[in-house]
Amino acid sequence: LMKKKIAVLGSTGSIGKTTIDIIKKDKHNFEVILLTSNNNYQKLYKQAKELNVKNLIINNKKQYLNLKKKVKNKKINIFNNFNNFNKIFKKKIDYTMCAI
């Protein structure tokens, strides 16, 4: 069975965190393709590590720079704004949870 590919927009807020908790309980059925946050780069980084997410968007420029410093894995794509959705959504995503 193929894993369902998911994007979680606003993953560091309360709805986003609840969504992530549900996904973690059923990891064999889901693959998170994208996580986004407005400001909370530390929580975004933690979620990306836990779920092996390769695409992150953080809207705040200062927090983007902090996240870039923190992420040592060059295989993780980090974007500073939502203009990069087109690049990411060329990948197949089955579900998008919009918690923003």
Predicted segments with their positions:
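Conserved active-site and cofactor/substrate-binding residues in soluble primary-metabolism enzymes
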Residues: G10, S14, N39, K62, ...
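N-terminal Rossmann-like dinucleotide-binding module
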Residues: M2-K54
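Conserved N-terminal catalytic core of the sugar/cofactor nucleotidyltransferase
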Residues: K43-N80
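Generic N-terminal leader/processing signal
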Residues: L1-K3, K72-N73
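A structured beta-alpha segment of the ubiquitous adenosine-cofactor-binding alpha/beta core
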Residues: K68-I100
